């Protein structure tokens, strides 16, 4: 394991050589697993979202924030951790398959979404980095395994943004299926509001 998580913390970075460019603005966002020990699968931890502000503060420092993507199931885990079990890179509980939200950050129309290959996309607030809501209801996605709150919904973590249509396109597929049952692949479109629409492809 080449990476090490650090949990929720903030930094103020100093420019130690040269000059920070004055013609940049906005922020850079990075997400990855908050993995703090070398054992186990690299993807098997909750997503830690990092925000690097490109405009220095009054003292010329670069602000860096880290926040755990605190989904409802992550909050349940803090209270009822004994109900959760890790199997390779998945986490299972009576609530379903935990959406670890740790693989990709996608922005469109001033909104930000985090992807994970075994869960619905999640919207987060780009200013506070706090969890807002999953994209679509569970019923709108193809489910590979049941779950009360989070069924296993295999949704490719890297959607395609269509800025003209103001929409996100996803691949939603079956990761596992019973013997004799063919796996399915669907193209999904979400217009940033309302229901997710899907079309089966072969």
Give the ranges of each region predicted by the language model.
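Beta-propeller domains
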Residues: 1-202
